[in-house]
Amino acid sequence: MPELEQIRCEREQILMDADSSLDHVFFPDSGVVSAVAVYADGSIIEMATIGREGCTAVQAVFGAKISSVRLLVQIPGGAAKMSRAAFMRAIGSMPSFRTLIYAYLQALLEQILVSVACNGAHNLKQRLARWLLMMRDRSDDDTLQITQSLLGEMLGV
């Protein structure tokens, strides 16, 4: 797609903040991005994990123009960046792209539902194991370079 710009994402970089204009969609091709909720006291907790299987800011499909989450780079890597307008044009004019995005939306919803169930039913050690596996699946690297502080925030501890 000609409207994609390749960018480098650095660890703990904020690609988009909550309550900011939803101007771009990011397609990680390496590395991992988390969609996190930001609370009034500044604390955060992870709601979704995005790697090469998907894209950020899919709420644009439903007409959203303001981001409801912070997009935080967990594992550095590359990504393709596309404007929200170009993303919406592609969804409208490319049936195969639209089908892929809808399939990803379904997978993302499943991921969020499993995460909610896991957070309610499992202890911290089990949640950590799930989180590490999700990071490994999306990064193709056995070494995860992440701080204990950020890991604690992602797990809500």
Regions found by a protein language model. Name each.
Residues 4, 22-23, 142:
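Short loop/turn microsegments at loop-to-beta-strand junctions
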Residues 75-76, 91-157:
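Polybasic "coupling" helices that flank or enter modular domains
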Residues 30, 85-86, 149:
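Alpha-helix/helix-capping structural signal
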Residues 48-106, 110, 114:
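Cyclic-nucleotide recognition modules
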Residues 7, 26, 48, 72, ...:
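Residues that recognize and position ribonucleotide moieties
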Residues 1-11:
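Short proline/glycine- and basic residue-enriched helix-capping loop/turn segments at helix->loop/beta transitions
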Residues 13-76:
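Cyclic nucleotide-binding regulatory domains
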